[in-house]
Amino acid sequence: MLSRLFRMHGLFVASHPWEVIVGTVTLTICMMSMNMFTGNDKICGWNYECPKFEEDVLSSDIIILTITRCIAILYIYFQFQNLRQLGSKYILGIAGLFTIFSSFVFSTVVIHFLDKELTGLNEALPFFLLLIDLSRASALAKFALSSNSQDEVRENIARGMAILGPTFTLDALVECLVIGVGTMSGVRQLEIMCCFGCMSVLANYFVFMTFFPACVSLVLELSRESREGRPIWQLSHFARVLEEEENKPNPVTQRVKMIMSLGLVLVHAHSRWIADPSPQNSTADNSKVSLGLDENVSKRIEPSVSLWQFYLSKMISMDIEQVITLSLALLLAVKYIFFEQAETESTLSLKNPITSPVVTQKKVPDSCCRREPVVVRNNQKFCSVEEEAGMSQDRKVEVIKPLVAETDSPHRAAFVVGGSSFPDTSLVLETKEPEIELPKEPRPNEECLQILGNAEKGAKFLSDAEIIQLVNAKHIPAYKLETLMETHERGVSIRRQLLSKKLPEPSSLQYLPYRDYNYSLVLGACCENVIGYMPIPVGVVGPLCLDGKEFQVPMATTEGCLVASTNRGCRAICLGGGASSRVLADGMTRGPVVRLPRACDSAEVKAWLETPEGFAVIKEAFDSTSRFARLQKLHISMAGRNLYIRFQSRTGDAMGMNMISKGTEKALSKLHEYFPEMQILAVSGNYCTDKKPAAVNWIEGRGKTVVCEAVIPAKVVREVLKTTTEAMIDVNINKNLVGSAMAGSIGGYNAHAANYVTAIYIACGQDAAQNVGSSNCITLMEASGPPNEDLYISCTMPSIEIGTVGGGTNLLPQQACLQMLGVQGACKDSPGENARQLARIVCGTVMAGELSLMAALAAGHLVKSHMIHNRSKINLQDLEGACTKKAA
C-alpha cells in the first residue's frame, strides 16, 4: 500500500516536472520573502550591536568549526568522486543539482528560523553537507537513466520512488528522532548542532520527494535526441538496478528502525510533555539566546551603509578560517575538474583493456578491410579501416573491442569487429598499454557474479564463455542478456551461441544477420529472445497519383511480379488522371465478454448501456484513460447470459489496440460498480474481431473504412493493361463476385488485396497478422464514358487496421518507409490524419494492384509472367536441403 502511494507520487511528479519545479521554487522563495517582509528587522552589525555575537566570534569554537567545514567539503568531494566511477555525466550533473537546490532550501529554512541572521547559516552549512546523502539521489537517477524512452523514464522514476521512497522516509524519521535527542541535552552548542541536523534531514527529504524527481525527468526530456535510436543518456549497464530484488530493503533492518522510531517518539513525548513542560520553554528561551536573538542585550544603532553594501562587505572580508575553507574547496574543485578524469581513465585502463584507445570503423566490404591506413590519436599510431577524417557523428559506427589473442609481442592486441566469438574481420592495434588478458578458461561462477555486479566492471570484463556458463547455471536469465551486457548486440550474439549448440545444424544461423541493428528500439516493444533480424527486399511502386498528390509506395515482399504488377497499375491510374479516396469511418474496436447470473440480467445491462445515461457513464470512464481515445458507440450482442460489448473509439495516429484495451478495462470497472454481480470473463471476447475472418468487421467496419475510385481511359486499358474494358468487367464479375460467393468468402470479393496490404504493412512497421481483417475488400468494375469503353474501378475496404506510431513504426527502417509517404509519427495539426492518409494510400495501392492483376487474368498473361519473373534462376540441384542431406 505504501509503495503504491509512493509510486503514484513519483509518476505524478515525473509527469508534471515543470509544475512541480515551479511550485517548489515558488514555495521556497515565498517562505524567504515572507520572512523578509514580516519578520523582525534586526540585523546584527548593521542596525543592531550584538555583544553576544562578538563573543561567539572570538571563542575557541572557530577551530572546531573550521575543521568541520573542511571535513564536510572532503565528504562531498569523495561522494562526487564515487559517482564519477559510474561513468555517466548525467548522474554527476543531476547530483550537483540535488546538492545545490537542497542547500538553497536548507539556507532558506535556516534564515527563516534565525530571523534573517546570516551568521548562524555560516555555522549550519557544514552540518548540512555532512548529512547530505547522494547515494539515494544517484540511485533514483540510475532508474531514470536505464530507460529507453521518455515514457519509460516516468515509469522508472515512479518505480524507483516506490522502492526508495518508503526506505528514505523511514530513514529520515529515524535520523530526525535520533538527532533531535540532542536538542534536549541542555548543552547550548549541542542543541544548535542537533537543530541544524534536523533541518538538514528535512530539507534533503523535501527536495528528494519533490524537486529532484521532477528535475531528473525534465533534464532527460530536454537532453534526448529523437533522431538516435537509443537516448544519449541511456545506460544499459544500469538496467539491473531496476531489479526490485536488489533494491528491496532488508525487512529485519526496517523492523529495527521502526522499533527504534517508536522508542524515540516515546522518549521525546516523555521529555517534552510529560516529565516537565517548563524546561521545554526554558530550553526554547535558551536556544533563542544561544542563536544571538536576545533583544535585551542588543542595542539599536544607525546604519552607516545600505543593506546590500553591508552584506557585500561581509562576503568580501574573509577571516583566516574562511580563507582555509575556500582554498580547500577551490583546490579540490580544480583537481576534480581538470585532473580527476585523467586519473580515472588511467586507473580503469590498467584494469580493463577495453578502455584503451578505441578505434571506430564504418561498415565496409570485406575487401576494404585489408587496407591498413594509420589513425593517430594521443601521439600513437593505430591501424584502422576508416580513412575519412571528417566522419559525421550521425553515421553508423561500430566500436572495435579487444579479444584475447595469442601473440609474441606483449604490446600487440588483436581486435575484431562485432560481438561474435567467430570474427569475420580482424585488425591489429599497436598500443603501449600493458596487456591484461582474460583467462583462457572460464572462472568460477562466484567470481564471475562478483565482477558482473561491480558497477566499475560489469559484463565487459567477462568472456562470452563465462556469460554462457552463468546462463547455464541459471544465474542469468537468457531473456535478459541484452539488458545485462554492455551492448545489446553482444547479448544477441551470446544468445545465438547458446542456441547454435541446441540446433540440428550448429551453423544454421550463419546467414541470419544480427550486427549493426538498433536493438534498443526492439526490446520491450517489438520482440523478445532476439537472435537477429530478417532482411526482406523492399521495392517501390509509383508514382501513385491519389487525391492530387503523388506517392512512392514501399512494398516489402519476396513474391516476384508483385511490385512490377502494382507499378503497372499505378501507371495506368496516373495516365487516367489519378484516383480519389475518402475515409468513411475511423474507429478501432475491442469486444469484451462479460457474464451475469441470468440471461434476464444480461438483458437489463444491455438495455441500460443502450440508454443515453448509461452510454454517458461508460464514455466518461473510457475517455478518461487517454487524450486521444474517444468512445464513439457500443455494439452489444447477447448469447444466453453472456454479454458481448463491442467498444468503438478513435485512437489518433496509433493503430490503437493497446489504447482501446486500456479504455475498455476502465469502462468495465465502472460498469461493474453499477452491476456488482457482473463477471468479466475476458477483455477480448473475439467480438472485436482481431486477426480473424469475421462478418462483424466486414459489416460494421474496424479501424479505417476507406473507398477509392478511378477511371481508366479505353486507350490506357488497351496500351498499358493489354486488354479491353469488357473483358476486365466480365472477369471481375465471375471471379471476384460470383466466385467468392461460391466459396463462401467473407470480405474476400477481390483478386489479391492481401498481397498488397501485407507488403505495405511489413515495410511500414504494421502488425502483419492484421492483414486478415485489413484485406477485406470488394473490387467493382463498370463501363464508363460516353461510348462505355472507359473502365471505372473502385475498391472499398471497411477494416484497415493501421497506425503511424507505436509498435514496429518505432524501428528506423520502417520509419524511413513511412517518411517516404510523408506520414511518419503523429500528426501535430490534426491527430489521426497521418494514419488516415496511410489507410488511403493502402487502398489506392490495392486498387492499382487489382487493376493490373485483373488485366493479366483477362489477357491470359498471368502464368506467362510468373514463369518468367517469379521463378528462381538458381540451379536447385546445387542446393542441399535438410531432407536431401539426410537421405544422402
UniProtKB/Swiss-Prot annotation:
The chain crosses the membrane at residues 10-39, 57-78, 90-114, 124-149, 160-187, 192-220, 249-275, 315-339. Residues 61-218 form the SSD domain. Residues 1-9, 79-89, 150-159, 221-248, 340-888 are cytoplasmic. It catalyses: (R)-mevalonate + 2 NADP(+) + CoA = (3S)-3-hydroxy-3-methylglutaryl-CoA + 2 NADPH + 2 H(+). It is a multi-pass membrane protein. Keywords: Cholesterol biosynthesis, Cholesterol metabolism, Endoplasmic reticulum, Glycoprotein, Isopeptide bond, Lipid biosynthesis, Lipid metabolism, Membrane, NADP, Oxidoreductase, Peroxisome, Phosphoprotein, Steroid biosynthesis, Steroid metabolism, Sterol biosynthesis, Sterol metabolism, Transmembrane, Transmembrane helix, Ubl conjugation. This is 3-hydroxy-3-methylglutaryl-coenzyme A reductase. Homotetramer. Homodimer. Interacts (via its SSD) with INSIG1; the interaction, accelerated by sterols, leads to the recruitment of HMGCR to AMFR/gp78 for its ubiquitination by the sterol-mediated ERAD pathway. Interacts with UBIAD1. The active site is at residues 559, 691, 767, 866. There is a cross-link at residues 89, 248 (Glycyl lysine isopeptide (Lys-Gly) (interchain with G-Cter in ubiquitin)). It is found in: Endoplasmic reticulum membrane; Peroxisome membrane. The modification Phosphoserine is found at residue 872. It comes from Oryctolagus cuniculus (Rabbit). The gene is HMGCR. Pathway: Metabolic intermediate biosynthesis; (R)-mevalonate biosynthesis; (R)-mevalonate from acetyl-CoA: step 3/3. Catalyzes the conversion of (3S)-hydroxy-3-methylglutaryl-CoA (HMG-CoA) to mevalonic acid, the rate-limiting step in the synthesis of cholesterol and other isoprenoids, thus plays a critical role in cellular cholesterol homeostasis. It holds the Pfam family Sterol-sensing. Undergoes sterol-mediated ubiquitination and ER-associated degradation (ERAD). Accumulation of sterols in the endoplasmic reticulum (ER) membrane, triggers binding of the reductase to the ER membrane protein INSIG1 or INSIG2. The INSIG1 binding leads to the recruitment of the ubiquitin ligase, AMFR/gp78, RNF139 or RNF145, initiating ubiquitination of the reductase. The ubiquitinated reductase is then extracted from the ER membrane and delivered to cytosolic 26S proteosomes by a mechanism probably mediated by the ATPase Valosin-containing protein VCP/p97. Signal peptide: none annotated. GO terms for cellular component: endoplasmic reticulum; endoplasmic reticulum membrane; peroxisomal membrane. Regulated by a negative feedback mechanism through sterols and non-sterol metabolites derived from mevalonate. Phosphorylation at Ser-872 down-regulates the catalytic activity. One of its GO terms (molecular function) is hydroxymethylglutaryl-CoA reductase (NADPH) activity. The keyword Lipid biosynthesis applies.
